[in-house]
Each structure stands twice: as structure tokens, then as C-alpha cells.
């Protein structure tokens, strides 16, 4: 049974192929974090359209309020314009490479039935989330706040699959490829790698379910890689090939793209891919998002009002969320919500004082269990990554 029906495939093609054939990526004019242009992909609710071809759509702020982000509103991110129509009956996951002792091929049924099941809640965040808020502007998809979501991912542990294939002692990296392709032969295939220790970590999954349902087409069906705590660039969609190798993978999307200045951010290292100048982006930084009140909201004087939002990091977990309403002179701790695990986001809330009329600026910062805290200022980088500065929202009490 096709993951994407013929009608859906035709609709998707009609919406995107014409632009892709010209080698264009059209970005809406209101792209600097604005939420004005909404469009619906087949099977999705209306999302904020950031690019037409390849499809890049972000989740509206209102849909980031629930504890789990719904499948129909989860953001969509593609690097290549030819979106695969995967047929699960014929899909196979191939595992091999020079450091694989027993190469294998698995059908979806075999993947589901041959290994212990595993589930975890985790934030999937595009590396460039909030790029559209950078000043000066930097190239790339101009995401606002919604190139992320929190979901319950279910599947099998990658390490169990790798062990079945036999991991040789010289294994250095594991390389992943998916079924999406490019229009032009010269366009580099989207292929990523992980260091062997991260690939063998018990939290790294091959998922075929999202929030208790089969993985949606636009989010990687029938199976995708889940790398909790690391940015979404490693979460390979429509997974088809896994290669275990004794050398550093030198593909474009590792050696040239998704890189940050070496030493600029306190994140996990990817030693085999580092140079003196740059290193691959890896973990997410401690961060937060205010979901209520919305920017420029008008609150009624004397009536109850609640600050609410989400906080997350790269996997140590959230220790506290602090709120300031006096120009950051003093901070109060918000109440944290349910703990879904160290890779999931954590809800927070705090009653707001609406006794006085006038403008109100609310600042929020999260603190991780490892002691990291959101900084006051953005660490500028040319790729537009890691915007985790203190979050603010300005409202009016009337």
C-alpha cells in the first residue's frame, strides 16, 4: 500500500515540480519569521510556507501549544526536490559497508519483527530554526520559531540493527541515505553520517511510528532516523541505506554544509569531521519558546492571564525556566509541567500581573540540568544556526 497515494503524489508534483525544474527555491516575501503565508500539503493542515521547492513548511505558533505536536501540523523539511513515493511492500533497508561483517537487507515487516521495540519522546528541531530572525539576514530557508516539534517516536534501536549486521572493530562512522533525490545530476545527494558512538547510543532509533500512528509521508515514511538531542539534519527521512565504514564520510552535506565555527558553541564534538576552522553542528542548545501570550497580544487589566511555553535542550533535561517582567532586573521561576524525558520539551507556566495598564515585556530563559542557560545575545554565524538567546514577547495591558 503506498505511503503516498497516486492522487497525493500528483497534487504534490503539481505544486512543486515546475519550480524545481528551473532550479529555483521560492521563499515567501514574509519570510523573516512572519506567519502570514499558509498552505496545505496533502495530509497536512495549513502550515507556514517557507519554500515551495523543495517543500519547507513550518508549524504555526498555535500548533506548538500541545505537549505533543500533532502529525498533521508537524513541520516539513526537505533538501532535495524529488519527493519519493515509497511503497511499503517493496521497501527495503540495506545495511552494509566495509565495516559491516554481515550485510543485510530488511523489509519493513522484518524491521518491526526482528528487533525489540523502543519508544521515546524527543524534540526534532531543524538546525536553522529561527534563521529568519537573524540580523543581518543570512542565506537559507528563513524559518521563524516553528521548524520544530515534540513527538513520541517508536521503532527499533539503531544499534540492534547495526549489531545484526556486525560492526567491525575499525568502524568510525555510520552513513545514512534516504529515498529523496534531486532534479539535476550535479546536485549532491542528501547523505549524512554519525560518529560510531552516537550511532550505537541506545537512544538513537529507526522509527516507523510518530505519536502512535504510522510515520506520515512528509515526515519520512516508512522509516526515518531519530537522533535525540541532535539537530534535525541527522534525522534522515525515507531511510533506505546504512553504511558502516572505517573512514570519515566526505559528502557535501558533511564536509561543506551544516557546519559552525570550531569552538563557538558548547556542544558534543564530531571529531572525525572536525577541521581547525569548522565542525559539524551536533546537539541542540538550551532554548525556550513563549507560546502564550502571543506577540502584541492585548491583555485586559485586572483579568487573569497566564504565561506559557516550552523549554528544551540537547539531552540533559530542563532544570528551571526563569521569567522577568522588569527589564531583566529580577527573575522568577516558572512552574514546570510534566517531564516526558530528557530529550522532550518541558512545558512551563506562570501567572502574569495585569493590575497595571501599559506595555509589558516578558523575558524567558531556560536552564539545563548541566548548568547551561540561555544567553542574552545571539552568537552570530553565517549559516544561521543556534539562535537560543533569551526569548521575549511584548504585550499591552489595557
Locations of regions flagged by a protein language model:
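Extended, aromatic/histidine-rich regions of cofactor-dependent oxidoreductases associated
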Residues: 3-93, 99-102, 115-116, 163-398
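Short Gly/aromatic-enriched secondary-structure transition segments
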Residues: 106-116
Amino acid at each position: 500500500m503506498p505511503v503516498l497515494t497516486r492522487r497525493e503524489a500528483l497534487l504534490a508534483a503539481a505544486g512543486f515540480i515546475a519550480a524545481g525544474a528551473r532550479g529555483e527555491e521560492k521563499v515567501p516575501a514574509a519570510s523573516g519569521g512572519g506567519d502570514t503565508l499558509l498552505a496545505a500539503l496533502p495530509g497536512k493542515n495549513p502550515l507556514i510556507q517557507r519554500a515551495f521547492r523543495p517543500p519547507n513548511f513550518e508549524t504555526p505558533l498555535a500548533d506548538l501549544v500541545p505537549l505533543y505536536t500533532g502529525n498533521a501540523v508537524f513541520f516539513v523539511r526537505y533538501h532535495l526536490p524529488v519527493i519519493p513515493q515509497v511503497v511499503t511492500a517493496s521497501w527495503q533497508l540495506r545495511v552494509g559497508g566495509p565495516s559491516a561483517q554481515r550485510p543485510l537487507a530488511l523489509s519493513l515487516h522484518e524491521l518491526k519483527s526482528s528487533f525489540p521495540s523502543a519508544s521515546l519522546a524527543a524534540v526534532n528541531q531543524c538546525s536553522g530554526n529561527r534563521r529568519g530572525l537573524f540580523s543581518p539576514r543570512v542565506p537559507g530557508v528563513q524559518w521563524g520559531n516553528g521548524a520544530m516539534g515534540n513527538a513520541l517516536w517508536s521503532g527499533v534501536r539503531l544499534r540492534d540493527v547495526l549489531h545484526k549486521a556486525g560492526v567491525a572493530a575499525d568502524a568510525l562512522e555510520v552513513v545514512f541515505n534516504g529515498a529523496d533525490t534531486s532534479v539535476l545530476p550535479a546536485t549532491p545527494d542528501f547523505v549524512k553520517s554519525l560518529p560510531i558512538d552516537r550511532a550505537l547510543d541506545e537512544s538513537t532509533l529507526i522509527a516507523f511510528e510518530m505519536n502512535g500512528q504510522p510515520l506520515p509521508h512528509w515526515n519520512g515514511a516508512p522509516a526515518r532516523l531519530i537522533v535525540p538531542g541532535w539537530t534535525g539534519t541527522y534525522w534522515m527521512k525515507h531511510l533506505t541505506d546504512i553504511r558502516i565504514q572505517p573512514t570519515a564520510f566526505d559528502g557535501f552535506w558533511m564536509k561543506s554544509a551544516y557546519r559552525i565555527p570550531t569552538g563557538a558553541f558548547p556542544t558534543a564534538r564530531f571529531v572525525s569531521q572536525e577541521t581547525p576552522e569548522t565542525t559539524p553542528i551536533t546537539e541542540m542548545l538550551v532554548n525556550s519558546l513563549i507560546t502564550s501570550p502571543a506577540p502584541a497580544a492585548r491583555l485586559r487589566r485586572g483579568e487573569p492571564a497566564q504565561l506559557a511555553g516550552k523549554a528544551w535542550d540537547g539531552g540533559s533535561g530542563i532544570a528551571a525556566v526563569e521569567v522577568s517582567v522588569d527589564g531583566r532586573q529580577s527573575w522568577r521561576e516558572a512552574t514546570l509541567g510534566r517531564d516526558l524525558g530528557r530529550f522532550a520539551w518541558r512545558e512551563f507556566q506562570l501567572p502574569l500581573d495585569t493590575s497595571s495598564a501599559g506595555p509589558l515585556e516578558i523575558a524567558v530563559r531556560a536552564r539545563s540540568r548541566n548548568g547551561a542557560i540561555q544567553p542574552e545575545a545571539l552568537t552570530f554565524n553565517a549559516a544561521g544556526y543556534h539562535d537560543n538567546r533569551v526569548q521575549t514577547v511584548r504585550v499591552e495591558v489595557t
